[in-house]
Amino acid sequence: MSRVGKKIIDIPSDVTVSVEGNTITVKGPKGELSRTMNERMTYKQDESTLEVVRPTDSKDDRTVHGTTRALINNMIQGVKEGYQKTLELVGVGYRAQMQGNDLILNVGYSHPVEIKADDGITFGVEKNTTVTVAGISKEQVGAIASNIRSVRPPEPYKGKGIRYQGEYVRRKEGKTGK
């Protein structure tokens, strides 16, 4: 049995979960998320718990079981507390600024890079070198943070670029002269 899939999901008191067929809707203080799950899984819901049940022990069902449970748990945590990723800009003259809801990055190109905020995503800029991406969908926050990082990934020689907070960048030694 899947170790993740067999865990029962606790539903906090200020969050409501509704299951209609294979669509799960989660409402909480921060907002609402809805997702269509695998149709083979079934759900047992009590007042404060939700259990994901797989129909058989086939390999296909086992692979989806834990994933489905983790996705539902992430939705519950997102509408209750939200998700946040922080990125750091390292380099001379690298800076970020807000323009309305959008993010403008000056990271060594001849032009500023503009990143638009999707629905449910907010950007925050602190000290011009720290960018915070926040939202209720873990997938969406991670994808946008990854897009921001891919504008100028950290390079191994000087360490310049955009990196996640706390990310270790492996440094290389430069060429040795004659």
From Swiss-Prot:
UniProt GO BP: cytoplasmic translation
Key words of the record: Ribonucleoprotein, Ribosomal protein, RNA-binding, rRNA-binding
Pfam families assigned: Ribosomal_L6
InterPro entries listed in its UniProt record: Ribosomal_uL6-like, Ribosomal_uL6-like_a/b-dom_sf, Ribosomal_uL6_a/b-dom, Ribosomal_uL6_bac-type, Ribosomal_uL6_CS
SUPFAM superfamilies (UniProt xref): Ribosomal protein L6 (SSF56053)
GO cellular component, one term: cytosolic large ribosomal subunit
Domain of life: Bacteria
GO molecular function, one term: rRNA binding
Record has RNA-binding as a keyword: yes
Key word DNA damage present: no
Function text: This protein binds to the 23S rRNA, and is important in its secondary structure. It is located near the subunit interface in the base of the L7/L12 stalk, and near the tRNA binding site of the peptidyltransferase center.
Family: Belongs to the universal ribosomal protein uL6 family.
Assembly mode: Part of the 50S ribosomal subunit.
Protein name: Large ribosomal subunit protein uL6
